[in-house]
């Protein structure tokens, strides 16, 4: 039953990634957020042509870990759905449909010059506040032209960039007093605390 519950939670999270252009998730540690995101990013790249997917992780080691999970998932894919690969490196993966996945540590210059179709920020609350602010300021105009964004993190500070986006995502009353499905910043918020993990003891 715990495995079924875990799979159901992952499906719900995948649905949140897919159904909303912008989503932000506040999640406890060991909740499967990186693994779930890796699966979704791989699917998105293989089944949507000419996409540039950027992984911006808290640290370079985190970016590499997500890419490792993506490569592992790719190798496990059945032949009939596995897209051809034209470049297979530690920091990037390029497919024969023109899509690519790039993994980098988050700096103020990450993603600069790229036309990003899908941005995934991992453990965004733990990026140094000044860097996170500069990064978000520089990357936001790119997303405004039609890109998707997925942000996941465990919470850290009350006034960092992650907290600001989370706060905006939870303000769902517009200027006319109507309740919206997404926040005033366009983000859909999702939250799961540590004791909701099916393997945790109550």
Q: Over which residues does each language-model region extend?
A:
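Single conserved hydrophobic/aromatic residue that forms the stacking wall/gate
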Residues: 1-8, 12-14
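Walker A/P-loop
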Residues: 19-41
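Conserved Walker A/P-loop ATP-binding site and its immediately adjacent core
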Residues: 50-72
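Inter-Walker segment of RecA-like/P-loop motor cores
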Residues: 65-117
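Conserved P-loop NTPase catalytic core
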Residues: 99, 155-202
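Structural recognition of the conserved hydrophobic beta-strand(s) that form the central parallel beta-sheet
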Residues: 102-103, 147-154
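Walker B catalytic acidic pair
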Residues: 122-126
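Short, conserved "post-DEAD/DEAH" coupling segment immediately C-terminal to helicase motif II
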Residues: 129-146
